[in-house]
A protein has these predicted regions:
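Thiol-based oxidoreductase modules, predominantly thioredoxin-like and allied folds used
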Residues: 9-13, 32, 55-69
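Chalcogenol-based redox active-site neighborhoods
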Residues: 2-3, 73-74, 100
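Typically the conserved alpha-helix immediately C-terminal to a functionally engaged Cys/Sec
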Residues: 41-53
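The canonical Cys-X-X-Cys-His
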Residues: 37-40, 82
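Structural micro-motif
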Residues: 74-83
C-alpha cells in the first residue's frame, strides 16, 4: 500500500479559504467532516491509503463548524462526504466510507493510473 506521506491533509479554516483553493488549485480532494464523526476517521484512513498515488491531488479537510455555508452550498447533510474538485468544479462525490479500492478506481478515471497494488485491483475489475 502506498501511504500518503508526501501529501498530508491540510485543514480548511473557513469558506473564504475553500473558495480561494478552488480558484488557485488545479485539483483538490476535500473530506467534509465534523469532530464527533468516527466514520470520518475511517474515511480519512482509506483516502490516505490511495491519495499518495495521485500527486496532482492535494488532500484537505473541511469541518462543518468551520464553514457551514459550504456544506449548505453542496447540499451536504451528513458526513463523511468526499469531493474531488478539478478546475474549480466537483467531478466526484463519495458518500460515507468508501473502500480504498473504490476511491482509487474513481480517481484513476480522472487522473490516470497511479503506482500501487490498487492499480492491479482496479484493472482486474
Amino acid at each position: 500500500m502506498n501511504r500518503n506521506t508526501k501529501n498530508e491533509k491540510k485543514l480548511i479554516s473557513n469558506g473564504e479559504e475553500f473558495d480561494r483553493l478552488l480558484k488557485e488549485k488545479d485539483a483538490i480532494f476535500v473530506l467534509f467532516s465534523n469532530d464527533s464523526c468516527g466514520y470520518c476517521q475511517i474515511a480519512e484512513k482509506n483516502i490516505n491509503q490511495v491519495i499518495g498515488d495521485f500527486p496532482q491531488l492535494e488532500l484537505y479537510q473541511l469541518k462543518l463548524t468551520d464553514a457551514p455555508e459550504i456544506f449548505e452550498r453542496y447540499g451536504i447533510n451528513s458526513v463523511p462526504v468526499s469531493k474531488v474538485f478539478k478546475d474549480g468544479k466537483a467531478v466526484y462525490t463519495g458518500f460515507g466510507v468508501r473502500s480504498p479500492n473504490d476511491i482509487y478506481y474513481q480517481l484513476q478515471s480522472y487522473f490516470g493510473s497511479g503506482n500501487s497494488y490498487f492499480k492491479d485491483l482496479a484493472n482486474n475489475n
